[in-house]
Regions:
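Conserved beta-strand in the GNAT
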Residues: 59-67, 74-79
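A glycine-centered beta-loop-beta connector
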Residues: 14, 55-59, 72
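Conserved GNAT-fold acetyl-CoA-binding loop/helix
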Residues: 19-45, 49
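C-terminal "cap" of GNAT-fold acetyltransferases
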Residues: 69, 104-117, 121-153
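A short beta-loop-alpha structural element at the N-terminal edge
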Residues: 5-20
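Conserved acetyl-CoA-binding loop-helix of GNAT-fold acetyltransferases
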Residues: 86-99, 118, 122
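A short, internal acetyl-CoA/4′-phosphopantetheine-binding micro-motif in the GNAT/acyltransferase core
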Residues: 78-85, 110
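Short hydrophobic/aromatic beta-strand element in the GNAT-like acyltransferase core
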Residues: 50-53, 63, 77, 107, ...
Length: 153
């Protein structure tokens, strides 16, 4: 059964929610790979203009942070409430994003031992670089669609 959710733009008031959720989900990985959690780093990287809040039953249950860059789109963060892990919401959110941006490169960085890595690989992301316990991954543009748009059948 498909779970219903909606997505709304974030505002400054969502900062604490996003901070707490990210720390809850990622603290162990940050400690294992980078020696600890640095609150100032999260604050420095948080831009509500790039963040969308996932809502279910009128409650925040996660967020997605993406920004355009010179290569296409960069997924800065996707976090869901632990109670939703493994229930298909993250897959659906990412599939919709990939469909909207199918003609662009979509990049992300993840820890090599992050369980979400399997999801990214299943959705077609490939590893382009392995560095200090992290993986740079990319989903290549849909070449068929790109070539049709350019008239190169």
């Amino acid at each position: 059964m498909r779970m219903k959710y909606s997505i709304r733009p974030a505002c400054d008031a969502d900062y604490q929610y996003c901070y707490r959720l990210t720390k809850r989900n990622m603290y162990d990985l940050f400690c294992r790979h980078w020696g600890g959690w640095v609150p100032a780093e999260f604050r420095k990287g948080f831009n509500p203009d790039n963040v969308s809040i996932v809502i279910m039953n009128e409650r925040r249950v996660g967020y997605l942070s993406i920004k355009p860059d010179d290569q296409g789109m960069y997924i800065e963060n996707i976090q869901l409430s632990p109670s939703l892990h493994g229930r298909g919401i993250g897959t659906e959110i990412l599939e919709q994003l990939l469909k909207r941006h199918e003609r662009e490169f979509i990049r992300l960085t993840t820890f090599s031992d992050n369980p979400a890595r399997r999801l990214y690989e299943r959705l077609g992301f490939i590893i382009t670089e392995h560095r200090d316990g992290t993986l740079q991954m990319v989903r290549l543009p849909n070449i068929y669609m790109t070539s049709r748009v350019k008239g190169n059948n």
